[in-house]
Regions:
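Positively charged n-region of N-terminal signal peptides that target proteins for export
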Residues: 1-3
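Bacterial N-terminal signal peptides
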Residues: 5-13
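Flexible, membrane-associating and regulatory peripheral segments of lipid-active enzymes
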Residues: 16-244, 253-259, 275-278, 310, ...
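Serine-dependent carboxylesterase/thioesterase catalytic core
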Residues: 18-23, 48-56, 60, 77, ...
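Short, surface-exposed alpha-helical segments at coil->helix boundaries
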Residues: 254, 258-262, 288, 292
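Short amphipathic alpha-helix adjacent to the substrate-entry channel of hydrolases
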Residues: 258-274
């Protein structure tokens, strides 16, 4: 038996530690060499893409431009230098100022090519051809069990980015397009479709996030993970988009909607009109309590939305629910009257024992004599 102890110890030690974003410590072999000829290739093909008279050359120019920019992006992220701006300056470029369509890589904890993400299923890999290098931006939060700002998911948020090098000015500028909100890149007076990898940010999020590791624990020891009951915004809140809330079922986690997100993300209508909110809860907790917490947290999200503008999109909220999630949702939007209360108590609420603690009395009222949610417009059970 003792001969098994060392291999077992090694095995369990190898399971320790949280996953980390890719770090480029050495410039890839294919990206080594002088900057100038690669920069000139990128610039020359940019000029072709800017010229409507050379439209027949655009497909080849797009490929050559992307190939050159991929090499330059490797140099930007892998070469020595203190920060993105310093590394950009070292190769004669600059980082464009962030705006509603572009991220600042200095605000991300990691930015790396989408090709560095292990895609769960090649058959379900969703990508779009176009100009630029699909990339993933990662902003870290705290792990499961550690407090974090409200509506921030555990571990972090993944951004869907497309990296381009803009030669419109004397100094080429790196642009990190927020691919979820922008479709094209202006080159000269021509609009060119941006490349995208829709699956990479989703698969990387679930590689980093611990929620999907808690399915069994959430049933057997739900009290250990009640602090992770909550609503998580997959992207920063956008007051112009309709929330679509996804509520998982028994012995499950929000990753139950992973394939749906993967299929919907490439759709422009979905990205234009909707934002995704994932709801997580321990499924081993009594369903009436879970339903109460769902109502409370959706109401808190409503308060957050109204504090950041009007609630027109909130009143168009869509909820997708599955299994136990459907039970929670149906209960949350249905006026119980006194039916739920009288299923548990014979005395009227006002005649309950005076020795009952105030917090217990409030729990009964919130759990059984509540007012239903009114914001959701559409619910899919």
């Amino acid at each position: 038996m003792r001969y098994l102890l060392l291999p077992l110890a090694v095995f369990f030690l190898c399971q320790c530690g949280s996953p980390q974003p890719p770090v480029c410590r050495t410039l890839p072999f294919g990206s080594r060499g002088a900057v100038e000829p690669v920069m000139e290739t990128a610039r020359r093909n940019w000029d072709i893409l800017a010229d409507p008279r050379k439209k027949q050359e655009w497909p080849a120019a797009e490929n050559e431009y992307n190939r050159a920019v991929a090499i330059l992006f490797d140099k930007l992220r892998c070469e020595n230098g203190d920060g993105w701006s310093a590394r950009a300056a070292a190769i004669g470029t600059a980082i464009c100022a962030p705006d509603k369509l572009h991220e600042d890589p200095n605000d991300q904890d990691a930015v790396f090519p989408a090709t560095e993400v292990r895609i769960r299923s090649s058959a379900k890999h969703r990508a779009s051809q176009g100009v630029g290098i699909p990339a993933v931006g990662w902003t870290a939060t705290s792990p499961v069990g550690v407090p974090r700002p409200k509506f921030h998911p555990p571990n972090g948020q993944a951004r869907n980015l497309t990296v381009t090098l803009d030669f419109s000015n004397k100094t080429p500028q790196w642009r990190f397009a927020k691919r979820w909100v922008t479709e094209s890149l202006a080159i000269g007076e021509n609009g060119h479709h941006l490349a995208a990898d829709w699956s990479a940010p989703i698969d990387f999020f679930w590689y980093m996030c611990e929620l999907d590791d808690l399915r069994i624990q959430n049933v057997l020891i739900p009290e250990r993970f009640t602090e992770e009951t909550g609503l998580y915004f997959l992207q920063p809140y956008d007051p112009k988009k309709i929330p679509i809330v996804m509520v998982h079922g028994l012995v499950s986690s929000p990753d139950a909607y992973r394939d749906i997100l993967n299929d919907l993300s490439p759709e422009p209508w979905f990205r234009e009109h909707y934002q995704v909110w994932l709801y997580n809860y321990p499924t081993g907790t009594p369903w009436l309590y879970n339903s109460m917490r769902f109502r409370q947290i959706i109401s808190e999200a409503g308060d957050y939305v109204r504090a950041h503008g009007d609630d027109r999109t909130l009143r168009k909220m869509v909820i997708l629910s599955h299994s136990m999630g459907g039970l929670l949702t149906r209960t949350a939007v249905t006026d119980p009257g006194t039916k739920l209360y009288h299923a548990h108590f014979e005395k009227p609420f006002g005649q309950l024992e005076p020795t009952l603690k105030p917090e217990a009395r409030e729990l009964i009222r919130e759990g059984l004599l509540y007012k239903p949610l009114t914001d959701p417009k559409r619910i899919v059970f």
